Amino acid sequence: MAMTSTMQLLVLSFLVIASLFLGATVAPPASLISTPDQALKDKADLIVAKDGSGNFTTVNEAVAAAPENGVKPFVIYIKEGLYKEVIRIGKKKTNLTLVGDGRDLTVLSGDLNGVDGIKTFDSATLAVDESGFMAQDLCIRNTAGPEKRQAVALRISTDMTIIYRCRIDAYQDTLYAYSGRQFYRDCYITGTVDFIFGRAAAVFQYCQIEARKPGIGQTNILTAQSREEDTATSGFSFQKCNISASSDLTPIKGTVKTFLGRPWRAFSRVVFMESFIDDVIDRAGWTP
């Protein structure tokens, strides 16, 4: 039952992306996203728990134990807790699913950053290079802070990815949608400078996108998409999302410039549709 719902989500992601980027006319029902949460946890292949009640106490141990080149979804259930780890999911760990107890309860946390000499690509708290990845009910964050510049929370560098009901928190360069087809549903994403960036074909539905208080002299920019060729079928699409200011930015939002995006490359493509956009966004919309 849980595996069927996971595959339904994969199908839905392809339908939506095909509709928005490849010209197909598709209107999939929202009921496709109906994961039976407890069933998914009950059928987990491995359990991670800080208190020792699972198979492992760290996420990295569970990822290492997952099979390589799997053709069926392999589920790792991560129980409530704070996991201070830098997690790397390699190309051979295909069809891996990470599911937590909630985006405010199961937290994956790191603090790698550019000021300390880490390249942006390598700074992610969670980096995924395998296809067929899914994350649900997790918080993924980078706590480096605005003064540390580039500090990625989540990097996705592969195809067929679904991020569902997750919180993705950082400041500059929060979410690196590096490549491939990616689908984000019911997520909460926060940041400051270029905090959703990359060259992926990414769809965001029913997501909360929240600009935070940036570092001194910085301008908030929600997106920096890097489509490099006019024939490339990539871009970012935001549908039925809510764009607003965080609690620390709200009192000063009149003094901080916040834009929907900037063209990172010549053929950058970003669309906001059927979404609420708060007055935190500059009237110009996009960077000059």
Curated annotation (Swiss-Prot):
Pathway the protein contributes to: Glycan metabolism; pectin degradation; 2-dehydro-3-deoxy-D-gluconate from pectin: step 1/5
Location relative to the cell: Secreted, Cell wall
One Pfam family, short name: Pectinesterase
Record-listed E.C. numbers: 3.1.1.11
Keywords annotated in UniProt: Aspartyl esterase, Cell wall, Cell wall biogenesis/degradation, Glycoprotein, Hydrolase, Secreted, Signal
Marked site: Transition state stabilizer: Q172
Protein name per its UniProtKB record: Probable pectinesterase 56
Native species: Arabidopsis thaliana
Residues bound to substrate: T120, Q150, R262, W264
GO term, biological process aspect, one: pectin catabolic process
Family: Belongs to the pectinesterase family.
Molecular function as annotated in GO: pectinesterase activity
Enzyme class: hydrolase
Catalytic activity: [(1->4)-alpha-D-galacturonosyl methyl ester](n) + n H2O = [(1->4)-alpha-D-galacturonosyl](n) + n methanol + n H(+)
Glycosylation, residue list: N55, N95, N242
Signal recorded as keyword: yes
